[in-house]
Regions:
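Conserved beta-strand in the GNAT
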Residues: 46, 52-60, 67-72, 183-191, ...
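Conserved active-site alpha-helix within GNAT-family acetyltransferase domains
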Residues: 80, 84, 108-126, 230-248
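Conserved acetyl-CoA-binding loop-helix of GNAT-fold acetyltransferases
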Residues: 73, 79-92, 96, 115-119, ...
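Conserved catalytic-core motifs of GNAT/GCN5-like acyltransferases
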Residues: 103-107, 123-136, 245-256
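Amide-forming acyltransferase catalytic core, primarily the GNAT-like/NAT-type
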Residues: 6-10, 25-27, 99, 118-193
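Charged, low-complexity intrinsically disordered regulatory/assembly segments
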Residues: 179-257
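Conserved GNAT acetyl-CoA-binding A-motif
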Residues: 94-106, 128, 220-230
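Active-site rim helix/loop that mediates acceptor-substrate recognition in acyltransferases
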Residues: 11, 15-58, 157-179
Length: 257
């Protein structure tokens, strides 16, 4: 059964011991997440009980790759086989479209979901960290916001993206953001009032990573996050040294069809 799952649906699905008891999406942030990551809500796999949606799996497709970006089941209907049925249907759906490679991320605090994904043939490819720092006081020089095309972003990054959400296409679809560049490192940053998010960043070594973080402090005073940075990268090591905190640790999972 398919229908368009909403922000309210996923906010309800994600409540519990792993995700907490607060809404993870607003209507605007949900729409932005869906658009930037090519999530096809019309193709989402859902399950209902009566008139109520009790589970949904929404995915994006880029060529022969798919990303299972949103998977959730109503807490009242867990352990009823809902997630298993949706996963079966979603894998079959993307396979029918020629997809040969599926990606997803799983919180390391969510051991049952890790075992669940492994049961479908997903294997761990890496470890991704969600980093954050508090707002910085003092005078800063704001960076100009601009638009860049996907090809220009790829030319700046010059390396495979850490994950689906940080691919050049996802960054370009953010529409307006700042580009920060230092020798050997770069960052694309989107700001919104008192909060900022690094859409993507990279550094070739420890020195360039440290220089990039100093530049971020000079130009981005807001609370700042960087999602899904590989745990073993020069940037992750520099973030730890600079006092950023780890908000989440995730397993990066892949499945080849």
């Amino acid at each position: 059964v398919s229908r368009h799952p909403s922000a309210a649906d996923f906010n309800r699905f994600f409540r519990g011991a792993v995700f907490g008891d607060y809404d993870i999406f607003s209507a605007d942030s949900y729409a932005d997440f869906v658009r930037r990551n090519d999530i096809e809500l019309a193709a989402a796999v859902t399950r209902t009980a009566g008139r109520k949606t009790i589970g949904a799996l929404a995915f994006g497709v880029r060529g022969r790759r798919a990303w299972f970006g949103l998977i959730g089941v109503d807490p009242k209907h867990r352990r009823e086989g809902v997630a298993r049925a949706m996963m079966d249907d979603a894998i079959a759906a993307v396979h029918a479209r020629g997809v040969t490679h599926i990606e997803l991320e799983i919180s390391q605090r969510n051991a049952p979901t890790l075992a669940f994904a492994q049961g479908f043939g997903f294997e761990q490819r890496g470890e991704l960290m969600v980093w954050a720092r508090r707002a910085r006081a003092g005078k800063v020089t704001a960076l100009p916001m601009r638009r860049l095309r996907e090809q220009a972003i790829a030319a700046i990054a010059q390396a495979p993206a850490a994950c689906w959400q940080r691919e050049p296409r996802s960054v370009a679809l953010a529409m307006r953001f700042a580009h920060l560049d230092v020798p050997g490192a770069y960052a694309f940053v989107r700001t919104d009032d008192g909060f900022a998010n690094v859409l993507d960043a990279g550094a070739t070594d420890a020195a360039s990573a440290a220089a990039l973080l100093r530049a971020l402090d000079m130009h981005v005073p807001q609370d700042l996050t960087l999602n899904n940075e590989p745990a073993d990268s020069p940037l992750s090591r520099a973030l730890g040294d600079a006092g950023w905190r780890v908000v989440e640790r995730q397993y990066q999972m892949v499945h080849t069809l």
